[in-house]
Amino acid sequence: MTEIYFPPRELAVMSVLWRNGSATVSEVRDALEEEQLAYTSVLSALQTLEEKGYVRHEPEGRAYRYFPTVEAARAGTSALARIRDSIFQGSAERMFAQIVSDKHLPREELERMRRLLTDRLEETP
């Protein structure tokens, strides 16, 4: 699998596209209002993402509508692999232990994680 990496600004833009399915430059800018980005900064990020092959655009009136071409789950898998390798010395077990030791996780979420782990164990020969 090819590694996918997004610098912070590109990740913020991609998050808007994943959440909304598509967006114009203005819509991305509005969604990121807390960052107070200039229109040209958002446009530049989208153009860079398009050059990298992570988004595509279609004309919409006088503007362009941008669409993600990579799924959030695929980007997440790549990010988790980087974290596992760089922070947890390649150990998924250490990473998992860190996640489940979080005292702020609600019991319901821990139960869902347990079911996911049980299901995965049943798939493994």
Model features per residue range: what roles?
Residues 53:
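Glycine-centered, phosphate/nucleic-acid-interacting loop/turn motifs that mediate DNA/RNA or nucleotide
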Residues 3-9, 60-79:
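Short, cationic-aromatic polyanion-contact patches
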Residues 22-31:
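Short acidic, hydrophobic short linear motifs in intrinsically disordered regions
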Residues 57:
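Short beta-strand "wing" residues that participate in macromolecule-binding interfaces
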Residues 43-47:
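Short, hydrophobic-biased segments on the C-terminal half of alpha helices
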Residues 1-14, 123:
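Short alpha-helical segments that sit at the start of domains
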Residues 77-123:
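Amphipathic alpha-helical dimerization/coiled-coil segments
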Residues 15-21:
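Short, locally clustered residues in the helix-turn-helix/winged-helix DNA-binding domain
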